[in-house]
Structures are given as structure tokens and as C-alpha cells.
């Protein structure tokens, strides 16, 4: 029984550490990322069944497992940040009901689809 409690405590502390590191990385990315403003819209590229997942910070470890968008969905990108040899974008997606979702996504999953403002 003691072993089970110990294992459970270890799992909880790993989860807590991952959440803390994602929060810290999100702060670093926010401070040091390249800001787009609201100039560009991007569209998810990929074949049917592809999912581009949102992340709470620009890292694979910070993936939000049930939050994703699919090909042809459009987002507004606000910021760019390079981490883990990968380009990430901080974006907002607005669904057909007007609900918005924001987070970090892999830039390679998108193409520029338009310009939001003249500057």
C-alpha cells in the first residue's frame, strides 16, 4: 500500500512540475516572442483527419489533448516564438458560435491566408 501511495504522489508531483514549467515557458515566450499584432490570418493545412493541437506554452509537453482545430479552420496569429527547434504561433480561433480559443500552435501546420490590417 505504501508503494501505491508513493507512486501516486510521484505522478502528482510530475504533473505539477509539468504545469509549472508550461506556465514559466508561456511567460518567457510572451516576453521574448515576435509580435504580429493582428495583421495576419492563417489557415490549417493538412489532409482530412489531421488535427493541429493547441498548447498552453510553445512545447510538446504543454499539449492540450482535447483542444484542436482541423484543416481549413482559420485563426488570427498574434505572436511567433521559436522553441525545441520549432516555430510556434500564439493564435486565437473563433468558432461559428463566437466562442474563442487561444493558445500556442505549431507554425508548420498553417499557411498565411490573409492580411487583417493594412500595416
Describe the role of every protein-language-model region.
Residues 6-8, 44, 81, 95:
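Generic marker of residues within folded, mature protein domains
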Residues 3-16:
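Sec-dependent N-terminal signal peptides
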Residues 20, 27, 66-108:
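SH3/SH3-like beta-barrel superfamily modules
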Residues 19-58, 67-71, 80-81, 111-119:
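SH3-family beta-barrel domains
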